[in-house]
Amino acid sequence: MPLHLLIPLLLQHLRSSRLSIAAYMTQPSQTPRILLLVVSLTSLCLSLSFSTASPQTDHRYNVGDPVPLFVNKVGPLNNPSETYEYFDLPFCRPDYLVKKKESLGEVLNGDRLTNALYDLKFREDKTGEILCHKELKGDEIARFRDAITNEYYFQMYFDDLPLWGFIGKVEEESWALDGKGPKYYLFKHVQFNAFYNGNEVIEIRAFSDPNHVVDITEDVETNVKFTYSVFWNATTTLFENRMDKYSRVHWQIHWFSFINSVVLIVLLMGLLIVLFMRHLKNDLIKFASGDEEEDNEVGWKYIHSDVFRCPSQMLLFCAILGTGTQLLTLVSFLFALAFLGILYPYSRGALCTSLVVIYTLTSTVSGYSSASFYSQFSETGWERSVLLSGVLYLGPLFFTVSILNTIAIFYGATAALPFGTIVVIFLVFTVVNIPLLAFGGVIGHRSRSRFEAPSVTKKFPREIPPSAWYRKTTGQMFLGGLLPFSAIILELHNFYASLWGYKIFTLSSILFVTFIILIILIAMLSVGLTYIQLTVEDHEWWWRSVLRGGSTALFMFGYCFCFYAKSNMRGFLQLSFFFGYNACICYAFFLMLATISFRASLVFVRHIYRAVKNE
């Protein structure tokens, strides 16, 4: 059955059910709290269980015990999305390849862990151990040479610790002794330096020895003896701190960004205080005193019968609020997992798994928010609002991922999702996501309350007088997006660098503070710009508050072009993945910030119109 027909049927079934719990949940005062509490606890518990799944080893070894080492992938250094399976290059390979059983998050992350011929045993040193003798043919030489030209690196995991190394090196013409052009050398020896504390592995380093190379400049069959060495050293670092080496933080950059954001907030607060104390407060005093002559000088008082008019495209409007609320809930859970230490750098697949699980479970929040708000204005049609909120973000996301997956399959990259993974994701979102979305919609409709409008809305809308360009939608979107963007641009750069480079964004507290600053700025600007809009008797503030709040995401996406131009990324695969996934991320921010902006404006508008005596 098509999905667009399945959701309304589920909604109708749940709405017509006569479960005893439904009667209890029809109490408006109880339903939101119970629903949010259940969803929150369930999402957090399941995220914890999926992210902290029991490992295959307890990371404790006796002397001589084999320590698991898996090879993962190879790829060009400057293109983090363009990775291929390790044995796509003609390395020494076992007779039988055994794929490590991976979680959903690891597969989504592009990890393809496989066994290798390396035999590393706990606290046993090895020197010049032969990995294999391999006769490289002309086409294999060409593949290695192409990889070296594109600065390919390899990635492995040793006791769940990541390690990297380069495949070879290029000796430019100026350094070549024969002066015949650049020389290409393949590293044939890898040295592992491992560190231990007691019976636990603490650290691993891999060095490709530049003194053990083979010239592969020409496509000539070459016999190569691949070797490796292992040296164990004691350290005092504790096991629980072994990931700290991947978490070096540049505090000066973060502090500069933080101070820049705080200064901007203080300036905006000062402007809003001046605006409200000098103008809005005086207006409220005049209205309270019943001074009709002075009342004629104020514009926003005259549109009290229009400001709470139901906006056009109500289905889409409520779907934006529902999806934005869901994404805000998802981000809150991600920060909670980061503070609990569940999400950390190089925790393979934990982030992707958490995203899938939390988004699926919080679909209840989307259905509830969309249906409850829509039902305040209409008794019918809320099912379509719930349906739209279910596809508003997932639809574009699935479309983008499908295109990117097709490109990855064409290139043979590890980013291509296996068919089994696609089936699992499809089942998750149909068997779990859709019923939860429908359930939230039913609860939201049944627990609806009357829309709290301080004044009665007239039947016909008041004509909006012409205004200057900077007071129209485009001007307010530019101002409402530029100021918050300027406050987060430094941290945004670090965020992009961690996604598309090799910078580790480890301070979740800094990222959390930046996100809170962004929310505060969006809310403050929304309130101020809404008041300015109302003073010129423009009562259509609903959609404008959404657009100017989400406009910050447009600046974020625009910065992607600048970031890409300054980076060393190249190739169609990396280009498509960079802009495709950034578009999905910025679209999510658009929905979240639009929701925040509207909610802030709604609270403000209700407050000022409650404070006046409406005739």
Give the residues covered by each predicted segment.
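Membrane-water interface at loop-to-transmembrane-helix junctions
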Residues: 303-322, 418-426, 457-484, 505-514, ...
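Hydrophobic alpha-helical transmembrane segments corresponding to the first two to three helices
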Residues: 244-409, 442, 446-447
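Soluble extramembrane domains flanking the early transmembrane region of eukaryotic membrane proteins
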Residues: 48-258
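Cytosolic juxtamembrane regulatory segments of membrane proteins
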Residues: 287-294, 451-466, 504-513, 542-551, ...
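Cleavable N-terminal signal peptides of Sec/SRP-targeted secreted and luminal proteins
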Residues: 6-12, 32-50
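Single-pass alpha-helical transmembrane segments
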Residues: 257-273, 428-435, 516-524, 581-594
